[in-house]
Structure formats: structure tokens, C-alpha cells
């Protein structure tokens, strides 16, 4: 009996205690909710009054005051104040800019997860073999913080902005992919992870605020003075090895008096010193090395060797039908008269061809007119990436020969580009388009594929590997279109090439079989034709559905990711055709495509081709034109300002860079381009938006915060024509250029 009574008493006590405790917790929660609600309503009311006061003018204040007084007299003061409070709360909730409660709840959960710590997260831990199990709802905020730790470790502590949130979203997705997380968990955890990247622990935020305060008011001034440089002679003396030349080939070198004059070129001290450039002299040692390593031989396995040669009759077997299809697509193409050819040019080039035309009226074109007159190209060479490279030589023929062959091939070029497009079934020969149109084409090509993959095809020394077989096949396409024996004879003179180089310190005479000459009228068109048809036939042979963007020897192949292993056969296939081809690392976003040393970036105008910023900020400060005076250099700066902004006015970093060039009423020198007047009005472009900064990061690896930091530094740099000296200094761009 006693035990039974004790049990009843204990049960009653526990029941009463449980009920009282539950009621107490409920009352506390209700009271807390009421207090929170009162705080929210009070905050909304205050925000509403602020909005009303900021919007009301004096006349509106008078009208509202009269309404308030009349309403108080009719219904009373208390109801009127209540109505005003309700209206103010509604206005504040809608337009007061207060963060909604559900957003504050998410932020609070993330902050609590940060407080619990993520010390057990190991960013170097091996990836799981199988997909993770379903993540419980309570653990999602903490897992989001762990993902945020890895994301921050990759791109750093970025400030709160829309562009940076897109960067964090992309990196968090990559982290989730490496963790092999379930698709549904990615959906629900991704926004929490992005929020965790931006809502960092309090101790981190305090240090970031301290850094920001320390940097305020401190900046460096970058002097953009004028620097003068001397031409460069290569330190490597190259000679053709024995057993490399064919029987009728050879190179004769005669030395003269040592050179006493050198090329002179200028640059402006830049904000960045990432790369160093040189310009080769027009000297005997440079011409000899350029001919040996860029015409006769290639460096393979550390030795000078003959370029690859195609197998016998391989071009006719592989590309015979393709060439005939191209010629049939082109159909009839009328040749120009000599006068029409000359009139298609302007400026000094037109005057040169006019003199050649007049001489052709007296003396017909001969074999000697096709001889090459070789010289060293004055171009900016990046010796930071490749110290002391072989100089590039230009090998033009006599203008008389160019007039004769050009009046056939110049009208053919646009027709041939369209024929290549029809062969592929879409725009393939990317020539003659604006940067906006090229960006649009590259983006549209990617939409063809479900899981697109983009692969660059690097043709090593493409001109040098154009063998006799390749040139004869190219010429057969032209001959099938024109069916003119005279053109056929002119084209044969491009196969057995004889050239000379007259220099102040010597003389070179050489003869080479095959090889594309850089000064020929059909150099660009021929490279488009050969490369497009080679890749087309390769895709047919291995059986892949692909799309090609071709700019001569620079190509990007679009294909499905599942077809990527089939490209392993490409180097051997091209090797049999006589070309040394390298398959570059595949990329999977449009911005990562590198085409003609540019990347497509989504700006306010859509996708636009943009050059690498580390190259622009160094190379575009070099002036290699001869006869530059102070006045011409000043006009050159004006032209850089106008031309740079026309292309990249709405582009991060580059727009700020070109705005620092001086602008003036004295425009740059007149162009020989026939429609130069179209550029006087300038390009129309919008503002730099968050999407542009995010796309720029995808293309070049420079985060939005880094972009803004570089732009702030550029505000303290201005190029000018005052001579001076400047020591290189490290900048943020030096650390971003490796991405």
C-alpha cells in the first residue's frame, strides 16, 4: 500500500512538473516572440517615418498635416495615431530596407554554425569513393561552413558583393563536386555555403576591418615616364646540321662590316612589370638564326632537325575529295584587273602597287619577281616567358608578283571563307569579324552540345610545316576554281623558293623547298584552308561530331565531353600529314577558351573577345614604329586611349587601364583603312556590371576584389612623354597572371 501511494505521488509530481515546465517554456517562447514582433514593428515604424520624411516635400507636409488634424477631430486622437503607426509600419516593411526575418534567421543559423567551429574539417583529406549519404537538416548549416572554408581557401576573403557571391557559388559547386555530394543536398546547401562565405566569423571580420582601415589614405604613385630601348641581337648562333638539306636547298652567308646602328624603340613605364620585352635588330646574326630555326629546321628533342614531312601522296588520298568539294562550293570567281586590284588598297600600299602595275604594262612578270626579300620583323618579344627566342623573319615577294597573283586570290578569299563555313555547316573561318561578333560565335557554338568540351589545337610552326605536298594541294583548289594556266604557273613559284636578305653587316642567299612564306598574298587564306580541311577530315576519320573555330593556325575544337578520349589519335594523325600538333588541356566553360590570345568575356554588350590583362598592361606600352618624335608619341597615347576604350570600355581592369591614357583634340595618325571614319564616333558601351566581373574571373582568374584593387592602383598611374627611368616593382597583377 505504501509503495502504491509513493508511486502515485511520484507520478503526480512528475506530471505536474512536466506541465508547469512546458507551460513556462511556452510562455517564455511566446513572450520572446511577442518582444521580437514588437521590435520588428517598432523598427518598421521608424523606417516608415524615415522614408516618409525623405520623400515628402513642404507642400505634402502641409497636406498630410491638415488630413491628420481633420481625422483627429472626426474619429479622435488615439485611432488616428494608431492608423498612422500602422501605415508607417507597412511603409517601413515594404520600402524601409530592413532585412526580412527569414533572412536574419538564416544568418543566425550560419553564425551559430561558425561558433560551433569547423576544426575537424581537413581540406587535404582524400576524396570519398562513393556519394555521401543524405545530409540531415540540422547538420546542413555546419556542412555549409565546412564547404565555405574550402572555398575561401581557394579564392580568399572576398568582400560582400553580387560579383563575389557568384565567384563563391562557382567554387562551392566545385567543392561539392569533389565531395560527390547528392544532387538534392547540393541544391539546399549551396545557398547556405555561399552565405557562409560572406558571413564569416566575427574575429575574421574584425581583422578585415582593421586591414581596410590601415589601407585608407595610403597609395603609391606610379610614374609613366618615357623609356628608350635599343634593339636586341640573339646570343645563339645557329647553323644548319649536316644531312638536313635536300640536294637543291642551301644557304650562303657573307659577313660584312660590323653593324654600327641599332633599332631604337620606346616604351612607357607601366603600372605592372609582369613581362619584359625586346625588339630584334635587323642584323646578320638575327636573320641567320631566324632562317635556320624558322624556315629550314625545327628544334625537336633538343636538336635541330628537318620539319616533319607527310607520307607519299597522303594529301590527295585524305583531302582530295574535300578540296574538290570546296572548289565546287565556291564555283565561279572572276579575277580582278590590275587597276581594280590597286584600287582596293589605299595609302602607301596603293602607291606601291600602282608603280608595280605600270611596270607590268611594260615588262611581264618573271620568275625573279617571285624571289623573296627577307628582313627581321620589328615585333615585341616577351622574353619573360621565353628567353632569347628565334627572331621572326618576313619574306615578301616583289610587288609585281603580288599584283599578278593577288588579282586572282584577293576576290577569292571571302568566297573561300564562306565555302569553309558551308563545309562545316556553320561559321568556322573566324575572319573579318568584330570582337563582339567573335565572342557571340564562340558562345553560340557551345550551345550545340549537351556537355560541351573545348580543346585548343596548337600547331607548332605551322608555316614551316607547310610541305610541298600541302602547298600543291592548296594550289590545286585555286586552280580548280580559276582554271587559268597563268595562275598555275605563278603558284608553282611559291613552292621552290629563292630568297635574299641584304643587311648592313652582311648578306644571305638561300633556297628552300616548300614552306609557307610569311609575305605571300595567300598566307592567311591558305592556312585557313589547310587547317580547316585537315581537322574536318580528322573528325570524319575518327567519327566525332565536332565544331571548329579556326583562325589560320589557331584553332579551338568543340565536342562532347564523352568524345574527348578520341582526340588521343590527333597528334599521330597530323604527324602523318606533316604537321606537329599538340592537344591542349580541355576546358569546360566558355570564358576559359583561349582563341587568338583572347578569351570571351560576358560584358554589357554580350560576349566580347578580351586579351589577357597581364599582356595588355605591359605590351600595349611598347612603341616599335620608327621615326617617333615627341609629338608623334603624344598622338600615339591619344590613339591608345580611343582605341582601347572602343574595345574594352566596359571591361574590368582594361577599361580603367586605357582611361589613364591622355585624351586630347589632336587625334592619332590617319589610318590607311578605307572606313577609318567609322571609328571617329567611338564605340557605345555600358557600365561594368557584376556579371562582367564574374565572367572576367572565369576567364583570367582575377577575382572581383582583385579587379577593383588593380583599378584603384591604376588611378595613380598616367603615361606621359617626359623621359625618365623607372625600376620594376611588384603589383597585384603579377600574382594574378599565372591563373
UniProtKB/Swiss-Prot annotation:
Gene3D superfamilies: 3.30.70.270. Its EC number is 2.7.7.48. One of its GO terms (biological process) is viral RNA genome replication. Residues 452-567 form the RdRp catalytic domain. It catalyses: RNA(n) + a ribonucleoside 5'-triphosphate = RNA(n+1) + diphosphate. SUPFAM superfamilies: DNA/RNA polymerases. GO terms for molecular function: nucleotide binding; RNA binding; RNA-directed RNA polymerase activity. Keywords: Nucleotide-binding, Nucleotidyltransferase, RNA suppression of termination, RNA-directed RNA polymerase, Transferase, Viral RNA replication. Transmembrane segments: none annotated. InterPro entries: DNA/RNA_pol_sf, Rev_trsase/Diguanyl_cyclase, RNA-dir_pol_PSvirus, RNA_pol_HCV, Tombusvirus_p33. It is an enzyme of class 2 (transferase). The keyword Transferase applies. The keyword rRNA-binding does not apply. Belongs to the tombusviridae RNA polymerase family. Readthrough of the terminator UAG occurs at position 223. RNA-dependent RNA polymerase that plays an essential role in the virus replication. This is RNA-directed RNA polymerase.
Amino acid at each position: 500500500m505504501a509503495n502504491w501511494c509513493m508511486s502515485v505521488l511520484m507520478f503526480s509530481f512528475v506530471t505536474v512538473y512536466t506541465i508547469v515546465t512546458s507551460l513556462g517554456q511556452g510562455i517564455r517562447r511566446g513572450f520572446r516572440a511577442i518582444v521580437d514582433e514588437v521590435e520588428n514593428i517598432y523598427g518598421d515604424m521608424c523606417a516608415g517615418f524615415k522614408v516618409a520624411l525623405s520623400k515628402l516635400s513642404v507642400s505634402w507636409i502641409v497636406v498630410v498635416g491638415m488630413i491628420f488634424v481633420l481625422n483627429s477631430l472626426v474619429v479622435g486622437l488615439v485611432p488616428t495615431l494608431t492608423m498612422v503607426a500602422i501605415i508607417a509600419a507597412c511603409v517601413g516593411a515594404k520600402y524601409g530596407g530592413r532585412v526580412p526575418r527569414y533572412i536574419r534567421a538564416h544568418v543566425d543559423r550560419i553564425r551559430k554554425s561558425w561558433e560551433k567551429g569547423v576544426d575537424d574539417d581537413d581540406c587535404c583529406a582524400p576524396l570519398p569513393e562513393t556519394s555521401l549519404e543524405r545530409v540531415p537538416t540540422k547538420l546542413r548549416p555546419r556542412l555549409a561552413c565546412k564547404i565555405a572554408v574550402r572555398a575561401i581557401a581557394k579564392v580568399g576573403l572576398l568582400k560582400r558583393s553580387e560579383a563575389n557571391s557568384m565567384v563563391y557559388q562557382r567554387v562551392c559547386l566545385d567543392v561539392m563536386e569533389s565531395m560527390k555530394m547528392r544532387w538534392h543536398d547540393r541544391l539546399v546547401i549551396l545557398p547556405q555555403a555561399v552565405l557562409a562565405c560572406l558571413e564569416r566569423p566575427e574575429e575574421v571580420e574584425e581583422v578585415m576591418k582593421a586591414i581596410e582601415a590601415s589601407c585608407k589614405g595610403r597609395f603609391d604613385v606610379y610614374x609613366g615616364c618615357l623609356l628608350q630601348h635599343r634593339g636586341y641581337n640573339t646570343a645563339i648562333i645557329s647553323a644548319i646540321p649536316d644531312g638536313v638539306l635536300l640536294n637543291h636547298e642551301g644557304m650562303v652567308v657573307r659577313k660584312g662590316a660590323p653593324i654600327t646602328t641599332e633599332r631604337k624603340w620606346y616604351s612607357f613605364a607601366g603600372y605592372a612589370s609582369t613581362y619584359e620585352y625586346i625588339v630584334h635588330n635587323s642584323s646578320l646574326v638575327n636573320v641567320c638564326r631566324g632562317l635556320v630555326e624558322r624556315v629550314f629546321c625545327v628544334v625537336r628533342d633538343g636538336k635541330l632537325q628537318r620539319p616533319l614531312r607527310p607520307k607519299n601522296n597522303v594529301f590527295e588520298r585524305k583531302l582530295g575529295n574535300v578540296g574538290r568539294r570546296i572548289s565546287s562550293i565556291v564555283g565561279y570567281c572572276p579575277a580582278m584587273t590590275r587597276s581594280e586590284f590597286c584600287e582596293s588598297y589605299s595609302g602607301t600600299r596603293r602607291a606601291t602597287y600602282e608603280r608595280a602595275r605600270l611596270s607590268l604594262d611594260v615588262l611581264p612578270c618573271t620568275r625573279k619577281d617571285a624571289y623573296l626579300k627577307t628582313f627581321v620583323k620589328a615585333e615585341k618579344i616577351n622574353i619573360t616567358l621565353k628567353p632569347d627566342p628565334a627572331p621572326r623573319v618576313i619574306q615578301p615577294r616583289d610587288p609585281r608578283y603580288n599584283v599578278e597573283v593577288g588579282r586572282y586570290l584577293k576576290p577569292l578569299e571571302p568566297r573561300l571563307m564562306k565555302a569553309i563555313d558551308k563545309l562545316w555547316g556553320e561559321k568556322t573561318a573566324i575572319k573579318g569579324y568584330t570582337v563582339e561578333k567573335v565572342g557571340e560565335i564562340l558562345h553560340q557554338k557551345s550551345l550545340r552540345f549537351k556537355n560541351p568540351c573545348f580543346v585548343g589545337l596548337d600547331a607548332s610552326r605551322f608555316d614551316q610545316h607547310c610541305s610541298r605536298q600541302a602547298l600543291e594541294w592548296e594550289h590545286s583548289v585555286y586552280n580548280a576554281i580559276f582554271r587559268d594556266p597563268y595562275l598555275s604557273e605563278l603558284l608553282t613559284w611559291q613552292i621552290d623558293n629563292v630568297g635574299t636578305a641584304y643587311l648592313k653587316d652582311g648578306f644571305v642567299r638561300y633556297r628552300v623547298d616548300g614552306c609557307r612564306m610569311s609575305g605571300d598574298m595567300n598566307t592567311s587564306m591558305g592556312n585557313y584552308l589547310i587547317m580547316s580541311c585537315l581537322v574536318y577530315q580528322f573528325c570524319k576519320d575518327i567519327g566525332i561530331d565536332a565544331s571548329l573555330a579556326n583562325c589560320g593556325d589557331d584553332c579551338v575544337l568543340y565536342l562532347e565531353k564523352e568524345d574527348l578520349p578520341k582526340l588521343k589519335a590527333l597528334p599521330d594523325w597530323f604527324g602523318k600529314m606533316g604537321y606537329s600538333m599538340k592537344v591542349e588541356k580541355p576546358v569546360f566553360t566558355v570564358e576559359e577558351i583561349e582563341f587568338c590570345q583572347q578569351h570571351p568575356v560576358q560584358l554589357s554588350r554580350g560576349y566580347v573577345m578580351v586579351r589577357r590583362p597581364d599582356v595588355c598592361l605591359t605590351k600595349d606600352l611598347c612603341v616599335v614604329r620608327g621615326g617617333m618624335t615627341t609629338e608623334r608619341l603624344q598622338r600615339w597615347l591619344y590613339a591608345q586611349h580611343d582605341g582601347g576604350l572602343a574595345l574594352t570600355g566596359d571591361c574590368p581592369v582594361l577599361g580603367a587601364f586605357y582611361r589613364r591614357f591622355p585624351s586630347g583634340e589632336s587625334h592619332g595618325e590617319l589610318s590607311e583603312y578605307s572606313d577609318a571614319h567609322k571609328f571617329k564616333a567611338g564605340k557605345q558601351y555600358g557600365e561594368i556590371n557584376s556579371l562582367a566581373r564574374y565572367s572576367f574571373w572565369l576567364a583570367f582568374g582575377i577575382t572581383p576584389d582583385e579587379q577593383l584593387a588593380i583599378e584603384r592602383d591604376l588611378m595613380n598611374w598616367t603615361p606621359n612623354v617626359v623621359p625618365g627611368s623607372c625600376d620594376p616593382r611588384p603589383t597585384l597583377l603579377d600574382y594574378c597572371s599565372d591563373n
